[in-house]
Amino acid sequence: MDIQFTEEQELLRNSVQRLLKDEYDFDARRRIVVSEDGWSRTHWKKFADMGLLAAPFAEEFGGFGEGALATMIVMQEFGRRLVVEPFFETVVLAGGLIEAEGTDAQRREHLTGIAAGESIWALAWAEPGARYDLNNVSTTARRSGDHYILSGAKAAVIGAPWADRLIVSARTSGDRRDRQGVSLFIVDRQSAGLHLQSFKTIDGRRAAEITMKDVQVPAAALLGGEGEGAAILEACRDRAIGALCAEAVGAMSELNSATLDYAKTRKQFGVALGTFQVLQHRMVDMFIAHQEAVSLTQHLTLTLASKDSGTTKLASGAKTKVGYAARFIGEQAIQLHGGMGMSDELVVGHYFKRIGAIDIQFGDSAFHLMRFAHTN
C-alpha cells in the first residue's frame, strides 16, 4: 500500500522534516534528554507555532482537520529523529479523547490550549498488576454533590512529570474487572491529594507512579458518559496504536539507513561489510520487514481516518506485525554494528531502546496477537 498524500499533507511532512533536520539532530536530542526537564519547551513552542499540535484536530478548534493522517505524518517524522516532546501523550491521547468525547465546553477550553502549546497532558489508565487490561480498574470515583472524589493508584504514566493535567480512569460502579462502570476524569496535576513518584524510562523519557487520596474534581470534569470509559479507552487505544506504529516505522527507516551506511564503510578482511552476500541478504530482509510495517500502518491509518467501525482487529494485527518487524530490524542493526551498537555514543542503540518501549505501550506484540485471535 502506498498513500498518495495531498499537497497540504506533503507540505506538513516537508515542514516537519526541515525543522527536525535543522534543529533536532542526535547531539541536540541527547542534550535535551539529559537536561533537568528531559524535554525542550523551546521546541514545543516551535511545534505549536508551526501548527503541528493542532494538525489532527478539526478546523473549528484551530486544526487542519487531517485527523489520523496528520498524526501518522508527524509521528513518523518524530520517530526518525527520536523526538521526546509529549506530542503523543498530549495531542494524540488527551487531545484525541477530548475531541471525540468532550463536551463543547471541554473542547473549547482544552483543545485550543493544546494547539497553542500552553498545556501538557498525560493519560493515566494503567494500574499496578493490571497489565494491559483497560477494564482492570480499582481506582474509585465517588460522587459527592457537585464533585467526584478519586482515590487509587496508577502505574507508569508516561509524560506525567511534564503534565499540567491528567485524564484518569476510575471506577464509578461495578467490580474491579467489570467492563461497565469505568469513567474518565480530567484532573489537575496539582490537585490536593495527588502525588507523583517520577522516574526515567529506558528510552530517555519521563514517567511516574501516581497515587490519589480523596482527590476532588468537579462533576464537569467527567469526560464522556459515566460508566462508559472502557469503551472510550478501547477506541483511544486503536488511535494510539496507529500513532505508535507510525513512530516505529520512522525509527525503523533510520535504523535501516544507518545500517546500510555502516555496511558500506566498515571494512573487515580488507573489504566493506556490505560486499558479503549473507549480510546483503540480511539487509534485504530488514528492508522487506520495514515495507510490510509501512503498508500495515498506512492501512490502519486510512481505516482510522474513515472512522469505520471494526478497527480493533486491524489495530492489533498492525501492532503485532510492526512490533515483530521493529524488533527484528533493531536486533539486526545492533548485530551488524557489532558491540558498539548498544553504546550511548551510537544512535542505533537509542532507536532500539525506543522501539522496545513502543512495543509495550498499550499492549505488547504477544498481547495483541491474542487480541487479534479473539476478535471477530
Residues of each region from the PLM?
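Flexible, small-/acidic-enriched active-site or ligand-binding loops
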Residues: 132, 136-138, 188-222
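Alpha-helical interface subdomain recognition
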Residues: 1-85, 101-106, 113, 117-118, ...
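A short core secondary-structure module
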Residues: 147, 151-195
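Short Gly/Pro-enriched turn/cap motifs at secondary-structure boundaries
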Residues: 87, 129-132, 156-159, 175-176, ...
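Helix-loop "lid/cap" segments that line or gate small-molecule binding pockets
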Residues: 93-102
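Short Ser/Thr-interspersed hydrophobic loop/turn segments at strand-loop and sheet-helix junctions
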Residues: 51, 75-79, 170, 187-191, ...
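A short, Trp-centered hydrophobic/proline-enriched beta-strand micro-motif
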Residues: 117-128
